[in-house]
């Protein structure tokens, strides 16, 4: 029996409604992360699920690093972003043991390096990765770069050190607050009236004078950071400037990162 014109119109309407219904059923694809490890990474981690941001501030004691982090956390959380902070010697697994070992100066350089790497790996696996998976902004008060620079300044093999930290995630942004050793001395003395044994490189035996040792050691660290900057592409910030100017520069850059760009 031939189809009537009315039936044809009704059929077309049904097909149109079906097509409209199917279009409504389309699921918006999830936002996938572009995270990568520097090397072998951690097995069985789905990088695509790490949708948060990892932001690192590097710099010596007295560089203003902690002050900037406090300001950035307040700013980020005030704008509705959940944040988590990590840093050197904050692992619940080994931080206390590492502190005691340093006080007694009882570890070889290789063992000390492995101790710090364990501290980092524990935080990476149990804090950084779960937080990124939950969509948090992770602020790292120093990362693998300080640990690598310390090892390299103390004569460790460059390739060995690079391999040791190849499990690290590549951050979304890294900022190195570059402050002159002379300025660092003034800031540390103003804050604590003393210089730290390890931050002065006294274990290297360069000189018995702690002030001279501090300047020499921090200069070596500075040179190592600038060398690493070429390989790891992080942003060097003039840390001798006014704290407010640095803060505004960091906020501008981090806003760029939050918009989906990599610094």
Predicted regions span which residues?
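Walker A (P-loop) phosphate-binding motif
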Residues: 47-74
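Catalytic metal- and UDP-sugar-binding loop of GT-A-like glycosyltransferases, i.e.
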Residues: 58, 177, 239
């Amino acid at each position: 029996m031939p189809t009537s014109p009315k039936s044809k119109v009704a059929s077309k309407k049904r097909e149109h409604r079906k097509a409209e219904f199917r279009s409504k059923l389309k699921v918006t694809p999830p936002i996938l992360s572009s995270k990568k490890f520097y090397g072998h990474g951690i097995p069985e981690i789905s990088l695509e699920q790490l949708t948060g941001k990892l932001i690192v501030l590097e710099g010596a004691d007295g560089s203003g690093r902690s002050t900037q982090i406090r300001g950035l956390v307040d700013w980020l959380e005030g704008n509705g972003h959940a944040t988590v902070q990590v840093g050197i010697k904050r692992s619940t697994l080994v931080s206390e043991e590492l502190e005691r070992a340093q006080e007694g100066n009882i570890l070889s350089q290789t063992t000390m390096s492995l101790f710090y790497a364990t501290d980092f790996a524990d935080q990476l696996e149990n804090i950084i990765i779960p937080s990124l998976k939950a969509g948090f902004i992770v602020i790292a008060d120093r990362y693998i770069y300080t640990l690598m620079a310390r090892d390299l300044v103390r004569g460790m093999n460059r390739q060995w050190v690079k391999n040791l930290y190849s499990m690290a995630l590549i951050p979304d942004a890294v900022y190195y607050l570059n402050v002159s050793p002379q300025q660092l001395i003034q800031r540390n003395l103003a804050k604590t009236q003393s210089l730290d044994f390890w931050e002065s490189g006294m274990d290297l035996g360069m000189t018995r004078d702690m002030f001279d040792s501090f300047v020499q050691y921090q200069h070596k660290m500075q040179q190592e950071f600038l060398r690493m900057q070429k390989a790891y592409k992080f942003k060097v910030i003039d840390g001798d400037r006014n704290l407010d100017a640095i803060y505004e520069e960091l906020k501008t850059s981090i806003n760029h990162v939050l918009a989906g760009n990599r610094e």
